[in-house]
Amino acid sequence: MRIGFRTTSVLKTGASFFLFLFLMSCGSENENSSQKNLAALAALIPGNSAAFLNGNASASPFQQGITASQIDSAFQAENDGSFTFNDSIVIRSGDGTSIAANLFQPKNLVSGQKYPTVIFVNSWALNEYEYIVPAAKLAKKGYIVLSYSTRGFGISGGLINTAGIKDRQDLSAVLDWLRANTQVDSSNIGISGISYGAGISLIGVSFEPRIKTAVAMSGWGDLKRSLYGNDTPRLVWGLILIGAGYFTGRMDPVIADNFTKLLSHNDIAGVTAWAAERSPASLVSELNASGKPVYISSNFEDFLFNPNQMLDYFASLTVPKKLDMNEGIHATAEIGGVLGLSNPIWDNAYDWFDFWLKGINNGIMMKPTVTFQKRFNGPRVTLPSWPSSTVSEKTYYLKPRTLFTDGKISSTQNTNNLNTGILSGADTIATTGIPLISDILASHLEVPVTASLDWLSRINGIVYESNSLSSVLKIRGKIFWKGQVSSSLGKANVNVYFYDVGSNGVGKLITHGTASIYVSAFETTDLTVDLNAVAYDVPAGNRIAIALDTFDPQYAPPTALVYGLDVKHNPSKQSTLSIQSE
């Protein structure tokens, strides 16, 4: 049965979005969760903003009833009496905005001694209590640790600035406060955060000379590319960001306005300028000139801050650096460390700070510069760098389908001059699945999205398939589909799904990519779709396949009208599938 893409979009996207909000709101009532996880999650719920703005800064969530006891249990295992905690910090930014913070310090500070310091920046929709467990761990090791809520979140004042100039000013004010009020070693200050905090950390280490190093987890390099990569709005994650921002913070109206512009493909130049100011990629030259070291963790199934833009950002850096690419959706590979659980990413983060801020030769710089975790929670592979000398691009040629056969993925060039036409207006069985849910199942529970490609609608989609592979195909990085297309309306969305097809004929979704066009009706245009990077071994004897269609629930379509999409096949301009592989 075919379901129109508008209906599918409403059902799948809406269900996933409200499930996400439901889980956020009632997670503390789940009787099956561990007490430690409950406490930590409860600590993250913003509140008491009115009390703060009225001057009662001490009435924080950390000091109230059941919330206080839950938060206490989250880091009680770390509380051995070796550190102190101050929950009444208020820092005034340059424009007078109140920034809420907390401070962990080693107990019995030695007069005149300076201490290495780490600043934690909250994730989107969370607050200064997000990192209480990591802060306690670091304080026990002799660090001063300050965590703060960015403006617009928690009990900090102001409107959410989305890593803009005001957020930079706030970070500088935090550094001023540390110097004036603590025994900070000003030559050994690090910064870290997850998601929103990661982006601000990368921006911070790039512009603030007082910050020596950064650890960024699930962050972004290019904000426009994250929200509008290949001219395609990230519908699901955009709605989550906007919804969570309104539910938990005080949103600057420009944020929703800009997302609306992306959905309508309006004033893209203006949104691009707004996003560039908030992108670490815009400050690469400054960071490279400073030589400051950076450790980055990113997740392969992060469809918000997708892995391709983080790989490109990492490749542009010439500073001492390390990159771990993990299985997981946005922030899921790192969240365990926030809850105090064993986590290799956080272990590396602690070692990174110990090496760069305390001079401890712990072997962190002897570890591989780049690691990729294999798809479906597999083992890690190591690479000497990125781009890697061990990875090359293998190119296949795409041959058009015929009346009775699907298209072919071949090692030899296409010799036929044929167009393959499909219609929009209906989804196919080629899909990323149910947003968030399918992504989590695949990345953490090894339950892949599958499709019997023989049943894919030839009216609404195209399949290309290879012969059985004679040897293992070790994918290490990006996959690129390159071709020529035209649309009867000039607008079109092209989604490319890459499958590992076993002997049973069922395709296992390995990765996908998307791109949209906005040209004149029937105008032929070159199009490249970069599929999300992945590490995966396709076994010998299996086949590889790709499916093309015009809708996926993760993304906003360029038009609600039905259009015809022509995919061109021309011997003089080959359509190709290029795979980065070992």
Model-predicted segments: where are they?
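N-terminal cap/lid segment of alpha/beta-hydrolase-fold proteins
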Residues: 69-113, 469-471
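Gly/Ser-rich "nucleophile elbow"/oxyanion-hole loop immediately N-terminal to the catalytic nucleophile
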Residues: 108-114, 161-166, 173-195
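C-terminal, loop-rich substrate-recognition/catalytic regions characterized by aromatic stacking residues
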Residues: 58-60, 340-582
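Short alpha-helix in the alpha/beta-hydrolase fold that links the catalytic acid
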Residues: 305-314
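C-terminal motif of bacterial Sec signal peptides marking the signal peptidase cleavage site
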Residues: 22-25
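Short beta-strand/loop motif that positions the catalytic acidic residue
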Residues: 290, 296-298
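Accessory cap/linker subdomain of secreted extracellular hydrolases
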Residues: 45, 49-77, 140, 192, ...
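Short substrate-entry loop that stabilizes the transition state in hydrolases
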Residues: 109-115, 120-155, 303-306
